[in-house]
Amino acid sequence: MSENIKQGGAGTFMQAPQDSVPLPPKDAEVMTTACDYCTVACGYKVYRWPVGKEGGMKAKDNAFNADFPHQQIFGAWASPAQHNIVNHNGRSHHVLVLPDRDTTVVNPGGNHSIRGGTLAQKCYNPSNRTSERLLYPMIRVRGTLMPVSWDLATEVMADISQYILAKYGEHAWAMKTYSYQYFENTYAITKLGMTSIGTPAFAWHDKASATNDATGLDDAGVNSFASSDQDWADCEVAFLSGVDPYETKTTLFTQWMMPGDKKFIFVTPHRTMGVAWAESTGRGMWLPIIPGTDTVLHLALARIIVENGWQDQAFIDKWVANKWEVDSGYGRGTRNTGWQWRTTWGKWQSDWKDYSAWILKQKEGELETAAKITGLRAEDIRKAAEWIAKPKADGTRVKASFMLEKGNYWTNNYMNSASLASLGLICGSGNRPGQMISRGGGHQRGGMSAGGGSGWLSPEKYPGRRKKSFNLDRWMMNGNVRFAWVIGTTWTAAMMASQALQDKMFSLTRGNPHQISSLDRKAIFETLKQRVDSGGTVIANSDIYPCVPVGTEYADIVLPAATWGEDNFTRCNSERRLRLYSKFYDAPGEAKPDWWIIAKFAQKMGYDKDGSYQWKNSNDVFEEAARFGRNGVLNYHPLVVKAKEKGVKGHELLRTYGTDGIQTPIRMKDGELVGTQRLHDPANDWDEVEGQEVKRKWLYAFGTHSGKAILLKTPWDYPGWSQFYKAALPRKEKGEVWVTNGRVNETWQSGFDDLRKPYLSQRWPYPMLIMHPDEAKPRGIESGDFVQVYNDTVYIQMGEPQGVKEDDLYFDTLMKNGHIKTTDGQFVAVAIVSEEMRPGVVMANFNYPQAPANSVVHAVPDPMTNNYRYKLGRGVLTKVGESPYKHSFTSMTLKPRDIV
């Protein structure tokens, strides 16, 4: 146990607070940026000035133009967590990273979360734990990473890559990478992987395949990020499925949703802070649902609405496709693409006449049956239906908006998201102010694909031999990957059956007898050649910190990446708002941005012979990438065109927009750039689009051939779900409970930054496990105890099953045909016993490196989407000792989170 504490950076300690912060002088440089963490991306200003110089206490002597001390709590002010000392042009400089009090969007007045309030602490400073940053390219020699030059590192990668591509083909060369860390980087990464190499073995950080998250929304014709912040302010009821925006999108909640008198319906097994606040004000309802059963709740709500005639019939008549419109635009070709065959398959395809009759026949939609399946009270389900759909006394309709996030679609991927879309549509939501259907968002929207890609080369097929995305986890587990480049992601901890994936990765890399023993380039190649020819794998890992375990244990080549603040980058937030994230300090050591690393490798591969990969700076990548986004909702191409007209760089034109930025897709009107507040809104049916852009139907209608939304049926007894769900249920005879996972407000993702920030690492030095007293007391567990979560039957889908018949990818058939194997998994966390969790469900930290909760989750994807059910773990809880936090008050509070 002590070793686990050591690895987690844990222990009881008291952070000695810094008692003063220097004021910026009048001539301090000021730059704009946005928060690096959640999808809201609050706007920030960076003040930079040389060490040895400070501003004065009088307004005339500091850059804040404010007298100090002052009593204005929301006035000019900086905390110790917002200050750091960095290098700029080789000299030490003070920096203050402060929320922009002058911005008019996203976070007006300088609102921000605790995550953004500690941004300055993520900047490299050799005097604190950011000194753990990767500083130099390294190659593992006899198990130890040794610093080398960029040339040698990329030459070694190119040597073995060329050999693998020639002998084993592009399928054997894989990329596992983030999808969000700035347009400049994701464009370069996809250009290399999808175009130059053309590998189908490509997957994003959060999925085993290059798939979409909320496929049910896509099929309905609803873009996952159609809404704006203003829509969440303007709605009268917010139906929040699998999400508490306060915990994960804090400023969206506090700035845009809390003001006024709107009502909140939270569908989540965890009574989080946002839930507690809404209930305490009389404006909220908590539906503590059993994980995975959201579809049944949606069916029950829809049935109540239809039975009472509360549907928005005028909206349905105008905006929901009839059966002929669903099929329109397909021609005579095969229904090979996922959304084509799903929306035209009778099991799901519907229109209002069919759906309204179907919903009344669903046994699971009957109120008492639904209450039993979901674990909710029947009266609460009825009350929720009234809130979202019952007309007001004067006959006007409630303005309801529907938000979903991972608690929804990562338990029952297709059916939960599709059924929510149908529920929202019959309530008249989806394309008008205050009445939207949208994801809340996790990370920011920084993906810009270079096109190409060979995902259709996947050896797997959906039933009917239809195209299916490539599952990289399964490809690795089957031993088919000879080279993998892992970029900015905790691959194993983020995926299902984490420990089984770790074991396999170890056996293919460090467990292989062929290990590098010197830094001679030819000798390295011969060694790695012998490894791949013996069935082993070579791994390169690009990251900002040593990544456990891929970078620290398995990777042969480790590359140091530059990140936020260390180069000029761009991306959008959840309302598609594009901003420049300004460079304001030097990257440490020899760390380079990922676009630069990609270009360096591509040149070693010879992919630059046609003039490609010759970028001199990040702006070059930004401008090249612009034309590849013209068909999408993140289109910023008009901005680049406008910049060229003005004779300035695209980055520099965007810089003039400051923290307000501009919402994509961008268009031209009267020669000026204009943003798009929301998608699908008929008010967007502008006149002829100026310049080089083409009017896209999804701007002013839904994203279907007809422009009308598709109403989808979601039968609870669909075998592709019901067979798996039956197998995944906690087994009472073993004393198992549901094991889900989630985020808490204070930390972000895997804690890559937060574990190195003094205050936050004191607050969360070790992963927690929140459980109800009903689970804790019989097991002798108290808050502060170390608890092991163990699942002795974790299912893993193996092989590349071919879908010919309809049931070929159903769980029972996969099991019968030998495509399901079982393993076990466990992790240890610190118990927090609280009634904030519903009985029968425990919640662990999302993606904590030393305690991968996904180890107890099944690696069997949804047969409709090829996505995992990330939050449907199960396990036995066992007390294994007391943590040092149980009797200490210096770190890791064990108090409930639902205190208001």
From Swiss-Prot:
SUPFAM superfamilies reported for this sequence: ADC-like (SSF50692), Formate dehydrogenase/DMSO reductase, domains 1-3 (SSF53706)
Site, as annotated: Involved in charge transfer: 113
Keyword Iron: yes
Null allele phenotype: Deletion mutant is incapable of growth via iodate respiration, while growth under oxic conditions remains unimpaired.
Chief location category: periplasm
Listed GO biological process terms: respiratory electron transport chain
Gene Ontology MF annotations: 3 iron, 4 sulfur cluster binding; metal ion binding; molybdopterin cofactor binding; NADH dehydrogenase activity
Enzyme class, first EC level, given as a word: oxidoreductase
Enzyme Commission number, as recorded: 1.-.-.-
Binding site for [3Fe-4S] cluster: 35, 38, 42
Domain of life: Bacteria
Chain positions covered by the region annotation Disordered: 1-21
GO (cellular component) term, any one: oxidoreductase complex
Family: Belongs to the prokaryotic molybdopterin-containing oxidoreductase family.
Function in brief: Involved in iodate respiration. May accept electrons from cytochrome c551, and catalyze the reduction of iodate (IO(3)(-)) to produce the chemically unstable intermediate hypoiodous acid (HIO). This intermediate then undergoes abiotic disproportionation to yield two molecules of iodide (I(-)) and one molecule of iodate. The resultant iodate subsequently cycles back into the reductive pathway. The initial reduction of iodate may inadvertently produce low levels of incidental toxic H(2)O(2), which is detoxified by IdrP1 and IdrP2.
Oligomer and partners: The iodate reductase (Idr) complex is composed of a molybdopterin-dependent iodate reductase (IdrA and IdrB subunits) and two associated peroxidases (IdrP1 and IdrP2).
Protein known as: Iodate reductase subunit IdrA
